[in-house]
Every structure is written in structure tokens, then in C-alpha cells.
């Protein structure tokens, strides 16, 4: 997604202004990389008059990082909470807690965009669930993982 970190009267906030939905089952990785580098990134730069400071990709998606390198994009591994501990909370649950807190505290906003909107995000957030042990179900979660990665970066950059 394209996220803007903004200073507000209440402090820092994360604005999700455009979304590229990754679905490896429907497009080849090379096509995804070409569209990200050739369409999505230029769109975000022009639409929001921005220059990205970094690209973060799911650590499990090495193929996409390699494909993006072909377009001159040096993508970094996103923080997936693999080693996080916060009190008695560990791993992915730390990132989920950060995400819940950001939403509850009014520090995360969706800004609708006609070209790269958030429909997949909105669908997934309604399907996100946990199993009987409180662990997130690993299904319908591409957008939720990406949200968590964005919030991890934001929280660790501005809040801790």
C-alpha cells in the first residue's frame, strides 16, 4: 500500500492512501513487479506528490523482492513481528495489538482512492479471525498482513 506518515494536532498518524492488492494466485510475480514499479509507484508519487523512503515486502516473498530489483527497487524485508515480545504477547500477536491500538486511538486512516482503492482491505478485515487458541487463521489475510507490516514500521518509528 501507499502510506503517508503525517503529523496531526493529536500527534503522528498513518494514512493509507492507495492500495495494491497482492494475490500471487492470479498473476505471475514478474507481472506483479512490473505493475508495482511501472504503474502503482508512479501513480502514488504523482497523486500524492511524494517520494517513498522505502519499500517493505513480506519476508516470505523473496521472489517479488528479486523481481523488483530488476526495476531498480531495493525492497527491504517487512517487520513481521517474528521476534517481537511485548509483555506476555509474542510474535504476530504483538503486531495485531499494535494495529488494534492504532485504530482505536484514531491514528490510522483510510483515504479513498478511485484508482487504487481499499475494497480488498475492507473485505479482508471483515473475514479476519482467530482459531480456538486465539491464533490468527492464515487465510484471507494478504491485506491484513500488509497492514500489520505498515503499522509495525510506523509504531517503531514514531511511538517506541
Model-derived regions: residue spans:
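Mg2+-dependent endonuclease catalytic cores in nucleic-acid-processing enzymes, primarily RNase H-like
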Residues: 10-136, 157-158
Amino acid at each position: 500500500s501507499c502510506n503517508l506518515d503525517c503529523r496531526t494536532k493529536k500527534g503522528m498518524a498513518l494514512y493509507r492512501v492507495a492500495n495494491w492488492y497482492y494475490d500471487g494466485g492470479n498473476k505471475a510475480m514478474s507481472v506483479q513487479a512490473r505493475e508495482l514499479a511501472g504503474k502503482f509507484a508512479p501513480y502514488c508519487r504523482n497523486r500524492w506528490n511524494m517520494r517513498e523512503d522505502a519499500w517493505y515486502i513480506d519476508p516470505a516473498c523473496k521472489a517479488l523482492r528479486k523481481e523488483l530489483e530488476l526495476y531498480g527497487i531495493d525492497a527491504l524485508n517487512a517487520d513481521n513481528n517474528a521476534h517481537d515480545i511485548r509483555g506476555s504477547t509474542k510474535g504476530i500477536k504483538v503486531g495485531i495489538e499494535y494495529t488494534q491500538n492504532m485504530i482505536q486511538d484514531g491514528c490510522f486512516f483510510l483515504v479513498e482512492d478511485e484508482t487504487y482503492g481499499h475494497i480488498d482491505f475492507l473485505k479482508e478485515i471483515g473475514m479476519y479471525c482467530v482459531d480456538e487458541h486465539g491464533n490468527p487463521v492464515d487465510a484471507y489475510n494478504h491485506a491484513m498482513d500488509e497492514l500489520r507490516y505498515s503499522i509495525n514500521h510506523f509504531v517503531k518509528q514514531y511511538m517506541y
